[in-house]
């Protein structure tokens, strides 16, 4: 079904297709095209020097007769720019971005009849009003008390600050740390292997690695190498290679001392008991943060379930490709699945990636709608703080001094997107609480 929009200068006809694809026919009045034609002539002739005329002062008629192709080309560009702007200002399905234009064609540029440009592009999705009355969240659970086991583990982690770390020549055993490097290469090809990571430290314990990964590196010594052939075509494609080589750079024995009052004072505590109190407060705050994140995740799921709309195909495909890559690489390199195990898991992983891609993209657009509908704002201080966070994630603690304008703009956009999403989801939580406490009719 086509829809039409118009004003004094443009008429826009839209044909909508699945995947937020829109075919648009934009027509201009003869008066506007005449104005654009004069602008095109003016731009061409400003650099033209003809005998008997000063630079840029030749009559329009001479310019048109001598440079017809240049004038036509410039006119078409101006017509396309004007028609593109009309998609948003006159029509109601604006393109996602200039890069979302799939095809553009000027089908008419006649001074007497006007101009016409046809576009095919991906548009922002059309989202109806959010049915807040359908939003329902479970009752927020009480924060669990900190257990003795959690306190003991926290104190043990603190004790590592004072630990002695000694590279040893013996074989590795449970509780040791190992320094690993991982490189990828291609069979039967010479060349320098590509590093995936270098000198990364792992603790040989079940809390920090899978049993399969740990088993590979128990009972080995520094200099040991583990080489694997990758059979999975997807993993080969992602890594641009089919041979994984793990190199054990060092086996490190870590001995942590007992904590006492003296060591507690070195950590800005008055005593060991004071350190334990501060640790408990820290663990309680972490527990509150985890609980809030659980509520946040529940709000995301609830919001995504109460409304549905069409998603832009290319954005969905890009997000699906990214998540598929991440899940398969995580299974192969982090969970350390064999090629056979990965093949058995692949179907489930692909389904997970598809569901996650749809949900996260849907939430991205919903968050922007909520942010605008609720008239939420981002303060300068909030933006600066989040830019610092994004900068540390990208560059570490010492960002480059000569950061480019493009990189700075990317940081601003990343920070703004993150804050927009967070504020929108906080609003979802607030609305859910309001709904839960409102008296029933």
From Swiss-Prot:
Main EC class the enzyme belongs to: isomerase
Biological process, per Gene Ontology: cell division; protein folding; protein transport
Any Pfam family matching the protein: Trigger_N
GO MF, one annotated term: peptidyl-prolyl cis-trans isomerase activity
Gene Ontology CC annotations of this record: cytoplasm
PPIase FKBP-type domain mapped to chain residues: 175-257
KW Cell cycle (keyword) present: yes
Protein role: Involved in protein export. Acts as a chaperone by maintaining the newly synthesized protein in an open conformation. Functions as a peptidyl-prolyl cis-trans isomerase.
NCBIfam families: tig
Domain statement: Consists of 3 domains; the N-terminus binds the ribosome, the middle domain has PPIase activity, while the C-terminus has intrinsic chaperone activity on its own.
Protein's name according to its UniProt entry: Trigger factor
Source organism (scientific name): Chlamydia abortus (strain DSM 27085 / S26/3)
Record gene name: tig
């Amino acid at each position: 079904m086509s829809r039409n929009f118009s004003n004094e200068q443009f008429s826009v006809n839209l044909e909508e297709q699945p995947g937020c694809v829109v075919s648009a026919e934009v027509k201009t009045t003869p008066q506007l095209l005449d104005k654009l034609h004069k602008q095109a002539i003016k731009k061409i002739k400003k650099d033209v020097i003809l005998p008997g005329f000063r630079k840029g002062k030749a009559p329009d008629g001479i310019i048109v007769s001598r440079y017809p192709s240049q004038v036509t080309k410039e006119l078409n560009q101006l017509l396309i720019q004007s028609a593109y702007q009309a998609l948003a200002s006159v029509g109601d399905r604006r393109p996602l971005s200039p890069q979302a234009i799939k095809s553009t064609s000027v089908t008419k540029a006649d001074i007497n009849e006007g101009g016409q440009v046809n576009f095919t592009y991906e548009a922002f999705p059309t989202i109806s009003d959010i049915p807040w009355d359908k939003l329902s969240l479970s009752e927020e659970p009480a924060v669990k008390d900190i257990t003795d086991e959690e306190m003991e583990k926290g104190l043990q982690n603190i004790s590592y600050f004072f630990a002695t770390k000694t590279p040893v020549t013996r074989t590795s055993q449970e509780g040791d740390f190992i320094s690993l490097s991982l490189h990828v290469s291609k069979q039967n090809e010479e060349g320098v292997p590509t590093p995936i990571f270098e000198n990364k430290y792992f603790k040989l314990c079940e809390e920090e690695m899978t049993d399969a990964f740990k088993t590979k590196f128990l009972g080995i010594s520094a200099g040991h190498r583990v080489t694997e052939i990758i059979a999975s075509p997807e993993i080969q494609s992602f890594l641009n290679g089919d041979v994984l080589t793990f190199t054990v750079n060092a086996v490190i024995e870590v001995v942590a001392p007992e904590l006492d009052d003296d060591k507690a004072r070195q950590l800005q505590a008055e005593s060991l008991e004071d350190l334990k109190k501060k640790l408990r407060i820290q663990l309680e705050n972490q527990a509150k943060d985890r609980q809030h994140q659980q509520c946040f995740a529940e709000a995301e799921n609830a919001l995504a379930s109460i409304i549905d709309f069409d998603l832009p195909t290319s954005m969905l495909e890009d997000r699906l490709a990214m998540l598929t890559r991440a899940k398969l690489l995580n299974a192969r390199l982090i969970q350390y699945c064999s090629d056979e195990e990965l093949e058995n898991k692949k179907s489930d992983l692909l389904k997970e990636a598809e569901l996650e891609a749809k949900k996260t993209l849907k939430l991205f657009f919903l968050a922007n709608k909520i942010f605008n509908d609720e008239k939420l704002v981002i303060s300068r201080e909030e933006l600066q703080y989040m830019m610092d966070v994004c900068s540390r994630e990208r560059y570490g603690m010492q960002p480059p001094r000569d950061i480019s304008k493009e990189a700075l703009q990317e940081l601003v956009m990343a920070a703004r997107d993150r804050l927009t999403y967070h504020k929108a989801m906080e609003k979802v939580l607030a609305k859910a609480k309001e709904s839960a406490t409102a008296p029933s009719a």
